[in-house]
Amino acid sequence: MKTSIAIVDYGMGNLRSVAQALKKAEPAADVAIVDTPAAIRAADRVVLPGQGAMPDCMRCLGESGLQEAVVEASRTKPLLGVCVGEQMLFDWSAEGDTKGLGLLPGKVVRFELDGRLQDDGSRFKVPQMGWNRVRQSRAHALWDGVPDDAYFYFVHSYYVMPDDPAHTVGETAYGAPFTSAVARDNIFATQFHPEKSAEVGLRLYRNFVHWKP
């Protein structure tokens, strides 16, 4: 029986890119972009994407009528958050003083890099845009076959700060180390975009399809 994956369509996020990457990573999976609570509840696995500003993402999720179904899914089935979808899982964001879903304890803060210089003498830019390494700070099934310190693609000005360090499974350096991947129980989430991260991103998506938390 095919594994069904629901990509939550609440009006924010690069849904088609995520869907195409998941289908390429695991052609046997049944991948669908969904916009009803019933479709989220019926799926075996759920992906919460997000891009842009967290206040807009939280508002759109609330107005979509899908928020309760996403919270339910976080308790009962594998859930993957991507980019702002990761940030939304936390309690609060400094971006617009925004309340998150509260599924993971912690907050979201902005890079404070004014005047800081990189090794080549250029200034750090916010947002961080481009490839950067992810150090696997804790073993996890979604890292299977993904080399430690592999490059993933980032586009963001804010990052998560989990209250519990044990929830951090990936770290990246940009001015200073920050949490770039988190996990707890059946939840896994990344600040980077696996769908924009070539083969290592596809491997992570394939691992998600087969993950049995």
Swiss-Prot record:
Residues 4-213 form the Glutamine amidotransferase type-1 domain. GO terms for cellular component: cytoplasm. The keyword Oxidoreductase does not apply. It comes from the Bacteria. Its main location: cytoplasm. Its EC number is 4.3.2.10, 3.5.1.2. InterPro entries: Class_I_gatase-like, GATASE, Imidazole-glycPsynth_HisH. Gene3D superfamilies: 3.40.50.880. It is found in: Cytoplasm. Pathway: Amino-acid biosynthesis; L-histidine biosynthesis; L-histidine from 5-phospho-alpha-D-ribose 1-diphosphate: step 5/9. Keywords: Amino-acid biosynthesis, Cytoplasm, Glutamine amidotransferase, Histidine biosynthesis, Hydrolase, Lyase. The active site is at C83 (nucleophile), H193, E195. It holds the Pfam family GATase. GO terms for molecular function: glutaminase activity; imidazoleglycerol-phosphate synthase activity; lyase activity. The keyword Lyase applies. GO terms for biological process: L-histidine biosynthetic process. It catalyses: 5-[(5-phospho-1-deoxy-D-ribulos-1-ylimino)methylamino]-1-(5-phospho-beta-D-ribosyl)imidazole-4-carboxamide + L-glutamine = D-erythro-1-(imidazol-4-yl)glycerol 3-phosphate + 5-amino-1-(5-phospho-beta-D-ribosyl)imidazole-4-carboxamide + L-glutamate + H(+); L-glutamine + H2O = L-glutamate + NH4(+). IGPS catalyzes the conversion of PRFAR and glutamine to IGP, AICAR and glutamate. The HisH subunit catalyzes the hydrolysis of glutamine to glutamate and ammonia as part of the synthesis of IGP and AICAR. The resulting ammonia molecule is channeled to the active site of HisF. Heterodimer of HisH and HisF. This is Imidazole glycerol phosphate synthase subunit HisH. The gene is hisH.
